[in-house]
Amino acid sequence: FMTAHITAASLVSENKVLTHPASVDTISTSGGQEDFVSMAPWAGRKCLRVIDNVRNILAIELLTSTTINELFHAPLKMARCTQPVIKLLKKHVHFSKGDRPLHTDIKIINDLIKTNRILSWVNKNYELK
């Protein structure tokens, strides 16, 4: 899982660059007659990319932490609010010790995050007190 963590670290570094304010890169237009050039479209595209990167980072963290718990620390009991998440992940991802490409599992978990299935599952299976 070292490669997965390297990927997550790379995505975090990319987010550092993407969160540089877009307004700093404003460009003069109309022969210098326009005082204001909206950088909103570029800022919006960068924001969407950051959101996608964060989903991938969370997917990697969920995959690696759940795999390690399931394969090496069972029967370590997770926190009550974490248990529903692990239960949902087990329905969609096969956890095994062998080497395998992780892309498919990361994509599955990313989709569970993107579609709010993890959040809905936790809300349904965990009662806040």
Describe each model-derived feature in a short phrase.
Residues 1-129:
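C-terminal auxiliary extensions adjacent to catalytic cores
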